[in-house]
């Protein structure tokens, strides 16, 4: 018969075993309270240890992140709709910074900045994730830009060349063809081992759907990632979009691969940042933008570069798009971006109305880095082409005031008009290097002099077909990066002349 003390001792031992069998780790979670909600932002009380850019979970699983750290409250940017977030609801720290999925499984997908699929495809939760915000590569890890990025557009590749790792700005008034140039460049990367990322910021959903359909129709979606911060998305998601897209591109760059990213457009990005900053009572500056708007864009674009081999050896080429108003390129955001980037391509509404497509104003466009990467075949014609075209544009302005022109001036005007016609190009039809060189040699060597403008597109195609079929060795030489001598240029000009006579 057991005594009372033995029973008590047995119970104590069983209690000790039960306590030891339970997990001993306790989790401490900081819980805050929403004080105020406005469109895109919330003010939260009760998170004393929260950090900048830390992810916060609101009621219903909605996400946001810490943006302002004030002494008595936290200003949060919402990544989901604020309709279901009310004052008094709970907010929980996630102890992680904003991140986004990365990897090859993203190719061909349409996602939002935090990696949620928008195309109805499978979830991407199993992919590795990397922070959206990170420092740009240091100077000693950067290599010179030496390899060209072919756009497939004659006017760009010949006179405003782009290199892999360059930041080339596309700017112009709305509806002048900025996105069209970017999409043509993406299409032209098919088969060139370049991964493309199209980042839509504040654009209409119908316009983005049209872009995706065009990429799919031209077999360019398989090597492209589409990141969308639509116009009906919260401003915080629009602000985050380019940083998340850049993180996706940096992942491939560190693997030694070449990436091209299009930001369409950073004007909407700046407006989203202005919206958030004004709601969170950050001091406004010029045009009501916060004083750090330059830093916001520079820290984004400085992440695009060409890495040395020890750092990965890949490249990230940026094509940011900016929308100007009434051709005012000296406004605040355009001048900021011009000073940050390595060159700009300006699209003129005047040329657009004249039917000159792409409507690139060569005189106001420049590539400060790409000229060193241009393939030697272009250099045979690019210098004469730019000089002749610049003289033509200057003479054309003065010729309006005079009806009596000498023969040399008339010849320069006629040649300039031919060059302008030959630089026109239909959208979604990027040209190969031999096709471009054939057209440019034909126009600079006078082969097309006297050809009626209405017959020029047909004759140009005939010249391109003739050169690519009759001069295979020269085409291979151009593709390999070798220079053409005068005899070879003359050979191409003779083939072009034969094609012109055949269609006379």
UniProtKB/Swiss-Prot annotation:
Claim: Transcription regulation is one of the keywords in the record: no
Binding site for ATP: 172-179
GO biological process: proton motive force-driven ATP synthesis
PROSITE patterns assigned to the protein according to its UniProt record, in alphabetical order: ATPASE_ALPHA_BETA
Keywords, alphabetical: ATP synthesis, ATP-binding, Cell inner membrane, Cell membrane, CF(1), Hydrogen ion transport, Ion transport, Membrane, Nucleotide-binding, Translocase, Transport
Keyword Cell inner membrane assigned: yes
Residues carrying the site annotation Required for activity: 365
Lineage: superkingdom: Bacteria
SUPFAM superfamilies membership: C-terminal domain of alpha and beta subunits of F1 ATP synthase (SSF47917), N-terminal domain of alpha and beta subunits of F1 ATP synthase (SSF50615), P-loop containing nucleoside triphosphate hydrolases (SSF52540)
CDD domains on file: ATP-synt_F1_alpha_C, ATP-synt_F1_alpha_N, F1-ATPase_alpha_CD
EC number: 7.1.2.2
PANTHER family for the chain: ATP SYNTHASE SUBUNIT ALPHA, MITOCHONDRIAL
Protein name as it appears in the record: ATP synthase subunit alpha 1
Organism annotation: Rhodopirellula baltica (strain DSM 10527 / NCIMB 13988 / SH1)
């Amino acid at each position: 018969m057991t005594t009372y003390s033995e029973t008590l001792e047995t119970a104590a031992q069983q209690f000790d075993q039960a306590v030891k069998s339970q997990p001993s780790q306790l989790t401490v979670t900081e819980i805050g309270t929403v004080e105020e909600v406005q469109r895109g932002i919330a003010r939260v009380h009760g998170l004393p240890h929260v950090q900048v850019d830390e992810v916060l979970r609101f009621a219903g699983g909605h996400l946001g992140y810490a943006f302002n750290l004030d002494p008595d409250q936290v200003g949060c940017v919402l990544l989901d709709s604020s309709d279901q977030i009310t004052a008094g609801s709970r907010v929980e720290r996630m102890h992680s910074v904003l991140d986004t999925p990365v990897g090859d499984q993203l190719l061909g997908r349409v996602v939002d900045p935090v990696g949620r699929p928008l195309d109805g495809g499978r979830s991407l939760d199993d992919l590795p994730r990397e922070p959206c915000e990170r420092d740009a590569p240091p100077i000693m890890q950067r290599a010179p830009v030496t390899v060209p990025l072919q756009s497939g557009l004659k006017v760009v590749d010949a006179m405003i060349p782009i290199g892999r790792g360059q930041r080339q700005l596309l700017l112009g008034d709305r509806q002048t063809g900025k996105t069209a140039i970017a999409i043509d460049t993406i299409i032209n990367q098919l088969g060139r081992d370049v991964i493309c990322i199209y980042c839509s910021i504040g654009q209409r959903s119908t316009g983005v759907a049209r872009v995706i359909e065009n990429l799919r129709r031209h077999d360019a979606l398989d090597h492209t990632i589409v990141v969308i911060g639509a116009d009906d998305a919260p401003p915080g998601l629009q602000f985050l979009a380019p940083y998340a897209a850049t993180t996706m591109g940096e992942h491939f760059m560190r693997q030694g691969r070449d990436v091209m990213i299009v930001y369409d457009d950073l004007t909407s990005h700046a407006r989203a940042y202005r919206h958030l900053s004004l709601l969170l009572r950050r001091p406004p500056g010029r045009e009501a933008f916060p004083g750090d708007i330059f830093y916001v864009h520079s820290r984004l674009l400085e992440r695009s570069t060409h890495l040395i081999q020890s750092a990965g050896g890949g490249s990230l080429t940026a094509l940011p798009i900016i929308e100007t108003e009434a051709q005012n390129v000296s406004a605040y955001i355009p001048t900021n971006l011009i000073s940050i980037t390595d060159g700009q391509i300006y699209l003129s509404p005047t040329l657009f109305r004249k039917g000159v497509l792409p409507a690139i104003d060569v005189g106001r466009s420049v590539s400060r880095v790409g000229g060193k990467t241009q393939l030697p075949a272009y250099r045979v014609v690019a210098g004469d082409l730019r000089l002749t075209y610049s003289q033509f544009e200057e003479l054309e302005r003065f010729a309006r005031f005079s009806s009596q022109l000498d023969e040399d001036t008339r010849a320069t005007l006629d040649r300039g008009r031919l060059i302008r016609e030959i630089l026109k190009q239909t959208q979604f039809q990027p040209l190969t290097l031999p096709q471009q060189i054939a057209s440019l040699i034909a126009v600079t060597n006078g082969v097309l002099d006297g050809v009626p403008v209405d017959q020029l597109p047909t004759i140009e195609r005939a010249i391109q077909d003739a050169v690519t079929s009759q001069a295979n060795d020269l085409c291979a030489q151009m593709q390999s990066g070798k220079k053409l001598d005068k005899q070879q240029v003359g050979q191409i000009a003779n083939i072009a002349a034969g094609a012109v006579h055949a269609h006379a």
